[in-house]
UniProtKB/Swiss-Prot annotation:
It is a multi-pass membrane protein. GO terms for cellular component: endoplasmic reticulum membrane; serine palmitoyltransferase complex. The gene is SPTSSB. PANTHER family: SERINE PALMITOYLTRANSFERASE SMALL SUBUNIT B (PTHR28612:SF1). Residues 30-36 are lumenal. It is found in: Endoplasmic reticulum membrane. It comes from the Eukaryota. Its main location: endoplasmic reticulum. Expression is seen predominantly in the prostate epithelium with weaker expression in the fibroblasts and endothelial cells. This is Serine palmitoyltransferase small subunit B. Component of the serine palmitoyltransferase multisubunit enzyme (SPT) that catalyzes the initial and rate-limiting step in sphingolipid biosynthesis by condensing L-serine and activated acyl-CoA (most commonly palmitoyl-CoA) to form long-chain bases. The SPT complex is composed of SPTLC1, SPTLC2 or SPTLC3 and SPTSSA or SPTSSB. Within this complex, the heterodimer consisting of SPTLC1 and SPTLC2/SPTLC3 forms the catalytic core. Within the SPT complex, SPTSSB stimulates the catalytic activity and plays a role in substrate specificity. Coiled coil: none annotated.
Amino acid sequence: MDLRRVKEYFSWLYYQYQIISCCAVLEPWERSMFNTILLTIIAMVVYTAYVFIPIHIRLAWEFFSKICGYHSTISN
């Protein structure tokens, strides 16, 4: 019963995605192009966040530690 409910939930989510993104009115080749472009954009955003967010967090930590006067013995 739980597996059926999960399957129905994912079907509902996919249906909502199709309605919101207007994929329901596209032809199959248009839908595949749209999904490919969307997946590529999402992958690039996730990769960029994975690469650059830790750098920005470190720089913000250094900036605020200098302002607040916190000096770590581990830092250079």
